[in-house]
């Protein structure tokens, strides 16, 4: 069930505040839906929490907002333990997908709503509303009513209403999922711009869309079955996922059977038997002789070597799929299917051709089975 868009009418923040979840646990009627979770979101950081439906990501956000009472653990916003505080005392704002603007109020009055609830001076309200609408690019729509706006414009107004109260933390719960693809793409860019303009704002962004997460977040947390199974800086987590679920949830990945043969003289790299060849790949540990999986993103494969250290798989082309700017090739590598994505391939290889697939050691990572 969707929640109403909520602005928490707390006093404006003093400086930046991060979020600390300390062994946070949530249970409904004795059924544990969020296993003990510890996570730190640094002040001014954007953390995207992603995962499939029922993974617990929205439960985390609702607990931070104060709509769910934890069964254990603590929640800190800045230096304040807010675990048992009501939502309106937490100094945060929240926006979800069904923007819930007041239909009888003009845009400017919707944005001013939280400030008026705080009983702020009229001059301050006018200043904050003007600034918030300017920030989201809606200054020219201040006198319109919600029904006169598109879905994307309504979502901008909802975000303006949230930031107008100057929250310490902004919670976004799948705010773009009700929009069509092009508007959603534009709104992702708008939210990224918003954070550039408000770098002191700490954002917890919950989504099932990995593209939104990869575009917006400084760090990503991946949820599964009520547990946080991966967490790290966005680029590092995408490049070197710790396990198969994280690798595949963040985008397409080739997952191949592999055996680690031992460490090399190069820091972080191990020799690996995979795809009928001995290659080098990134590893978080000094594995030797264990059955592992090798993860390689399709776009990290090429038809020509990029360096003297490039790895090589011998492959047979199975199929070619052209999709505008991209060409998708499916290849057989030692009995396993490998996908690669290329741009501007001319001439295109033909089905049945023998190919050499090249990739850099750091673009391949050993992960757990």
Curated annotation (Swiss-Prot):
> SMART domains in the record, alphabetically?
AAA (SM00382)
Q: What induces it?
A: Induced when inorganic phosphate is limiting; this is controlled by PhoB.
Q: Which UniProt keywords apply?
A: ATP-binding, Cell inner membrane, Cell membrane, Membrane, Nucleotide-binding, Transport
Please give the chief subcellular localization of this protein: membrane
State where the protein is found: Cell inner membrane
Q: Which Gene3D superfamilies match?
A: 2.40.50.100, P-loop containing nucleotide triphosphate hydrolases
| Signal sequence, start to end | none
What PROSITE patterns would the database entry show?
ABC_TRANSPORTER_1 (PS00211), ABC_TRANSPORTER_2 (PS50893)
The ABC transporter domain covers 19-250
Example of a GO cellular component annotation carried by this entry: ATP-binding cassette (ABC) transporter complex
Membrane among keywords: yes
Q: How does it sit in the membrane?
A: Peripheral membrane protein
Q: Where does this protein hold ATP? A: 51-58
Q: Which GO terms describe its molecular function?
A: ATP binding; ATP hydrolysis activity; transmembrane transporter activity
The role this protein plays is: Probably part of the PhnSTUV complex (TC 3.A.1.11.5) involved in 2-aminoethylphosphonate import. Probably responsible for energy coupling to the transport system.
Family the UniProt entry places it in: Belongs to the ABC transporter superfamily. 2-aminoethylphosphonate importer (TC 3.A.1.11.5) family.
What other facts are recorded? Maps to a phosphate-starvation-inducible locus previously known as psiC.
Do you know which PANTHER family this protein is assigned to? SPERMIDINE/PUTRESCINE IMPORT ATP-BINDING PROTEIN POTA, SPERMIDINE_PUTRESCINE IMPORT ATP-BINDING PROTEIN POTA
Protein name, per record: Putative 2-aminoethylphosphonate import ATP-binding protein PhnT
What is the organism field in this record? Salmonella typhimurium (strain LT2 / SGSC1412 / ATCC 700720)
Task: Please name the gene that encodes this protein.
Answer: phnT
